[in-house]
Amino acid sequence: MRGGGFGDRDRDRDRGGFGARGGSGLPPKKFGNPGERLRKKKWDLSELPKFEKNFYVEHPEVARLTPYEVDELRRKKEITVRGGDVCPKPVFAFHHANFPQYVMDVLMDQHFTEPTPIQCQGFPLALSGRDMVGIAQTGSGKTLAYLLPAIVHINHQPYLERGDGPICLVLAPTRELAQQVQQVADDYGKCSRLKSTCIYGGAPKGPQIRDLERGVEICIATPGRLIDFLESGKTNLRRCTYLVLDEADRMLDMGFEPQIRKIVDQIRPDRQTLMWSATWPKEVRQLAEDFLRDYTQINVGNLELSANHNILQIVDVCMESEKDHKLIQLMEEIMAEKENKTIIFVETKRRCDDLTRRMRRDGWPAMCIHGDKSQPERDWVLNEFRSGKAPILIATDVASRGLDVEDVKFVINYDYPNSSEDYVHRIGRTARSTNKGTAYTFFTPGNLKQARELIKVLEEANQAINPKLMQLVDHRGGGGGGGGRSRYRTTSSANNPNLMYQDECDRRLRGVKDGGRRDSTSYRDRSETDRASYANGSGYGSPNSAFGAQAGQYTYAQGTYGAAAYGTSGYTAQEYAAGTYGASSTASAGRSSQSSSQQFSGIGRSGQQPQPLMSQQFAQPPGATNMIGYMGQTAYQYPPPPPPPPPSRK
């Protein structure tokens, strides 16, 4: 039943607003704990204006589904429903949700054909005004699952008046995620003249305050900056009736629980609340119990910690000292791919800067992002990465959640994270939506405590498990592997294509270490040529292999580059190994003879010749100058970028 209230905005533009205007009038806070000036409001529901939040009309095709068909649809899409009263039937097409035509037009323009599993069940729940918890892997389409119902919700509320705060509030853990959500909100809200803003720390307050003062229906915010604005009276949440907690587990990991509780205390208790998370630990469960009323939990996939099944996960057990050499071998193969956008995750800001400096010194088109970077610099780096001008992004966990770049094909965990939850979110930066991707992980004995959890994640995703990883667990005292562990041990490669693939990946990770020819493909799904090569015994290193001395590939056996393979820099393998290649090749690669002597002391290329595609794609243009001066090293030559805009005065 629809609750009584204002109904459609077009019918009620003359109705009254939601209380006093202008904000709280509190003086700005300069010291103390965030949110200490905010007091929990005492709400009297009988005095609050009524509002409508149930707008769901079941489509006839959905209404005709029998209970058996509903169960079968949920089973096929791996949807599990728990709690609440009777849950609405899932939809299986966008038009079943009865969205307004302007929303359907945008969906069609973006070539969406059918809703994702989380959207199939999330749309009916959110449109019916119910509180809900959505548990799904990254890249599952949860942003649309709450934003499209939010647009419908807003358009059934009275118009904002001067001094009113937002109707829909989305809390996000990072500024990157907040910016991405706002972009989606702009794409779908502009057709209905809805305004949105994104407020986050690290950026000037002035433009954000002006947006709030002009009035926005949708506010996407990080907790810290929103607390600041609430305390200083720059905005209020009296009009907020639709609350979204996006990536709730991540916000708790980052220590935002006190701020979240302060913020929620400012919102009327009969609001509609939607919580989204990739994991379901006890801390998130407690938050749901405190903030949600009679909620329904929907889960897509396994209830345990799970990774995206579209990601091929490869774990290389190695020593800490081997990481640099293995990384360069890996990057040479990745950069030979047509689609090679890669994120490399490291543990600390210092290592992030150091690794970026060393890779750029040796010619890799790498840039970095971490929490100490200014907002203009972060925005510029992400734009360069998205555009493909710098296809290698080195990052700390600041980018492991919320960073949505559709065409990231590879993720490399240079340092294994502190928890399996962070591992799942890191590798979730690839294989967004229905795409496929590959994740490589360097796992050292120092990460032994996480071995069991990693094995569980691999087994759940039906991935092959590196025997060295199993040996680490056995050496520590067994356990954790379960039945899956014995299965991979006892099954032969001939009968287990997944394990055969893993064996081949291990062989290729070794690269030139064993003296074999370098390959120029990635470790992704095999083509028909690959399978035939493997089946007839030629393998990837055979003279008859598909990756032999062809045009566009270098010929290691002869030790010389052809002109077609390496442009004008035709120096020999012997010259490269000795560091004495000629001046002509040095000029074409944009390096000096002095920098060549430095090349082999850092994270330079492996003992093989440089990757040919790198010189073709990233050769120095005429008149180029250093790209970035902050590296503190002689950098590879690029066209100078436009400087980031100077921060405006607050």
From Swiss-Prot:
- Compositional bias (Pro residues) spans? 638-650
The protein here is known as: Probable ATP-dependent RNA helicase DDX17
Give the residue ranges of motif DEAD box.
Answer: 246-249
The UniProt entry lists the main location of this chain as nucleus
**Which stretches does the entry tag as region Transactivation domain?**
468-650
Q: Where are the transmembrane segments?
A: none
- Bias class Polar residues marks the residues at 489-499, 610-619
Function (record text): As an RNA helicase, unwinds RNA and alters RNA structures through ATP binding and hydrolysis. Involved in multiple cellular processes, including pre-mRNA splicing, alternative splicing, ribosomal RNA processing and miRNA processing, as well as transcription regulation. Regulates the alternative splicing of exons exhibiting specific features. This function requires the RNA helicase activity. Affects NFAT5 and histone macro-H2A.1/MACROH2A1 alternative splicing in a CDK9-dependent manner.
* UniProt binding sites for ATP: 136-143
Mind telling me where the Glycyl lysine isopeptide (Lys-Gly) (interchain with G-Cter in SUMO2) cross-link is? 50, 449
Phosphothreonine sites (modified residues)? 444
* Positions occupied by motif Q motif: 92-120
Chain spans, region Disordered? 1-38, 472-543, 583-650
Residues with N6-acetyllysine modification: 29-30, 42
Q: How is it modified after translation?
A: Sumoylation significantly increases stability. It also promotes interaction specifically with HDAC1 (but not HDAC2, nor HDAC3) and strongly stimulates ESR1 and TP53 coactivation. Acetylation at lysine residues stabilizes the protein, stimulates interaction with HDAC1 and HDAC3, but not HDAC2, and represses ESR1 and TP53 coactivation activity.
> Per UniProt, what is one Pfam family of this protein?
Helicase_C
Report the family membership: Belongs to the DEAD box helicase family. DDX5/DBP2 subfamily.
Q: Helicase ATP-binding domain location, by residue?
A: 123-298
Source organism (scientific name): Mus musculus
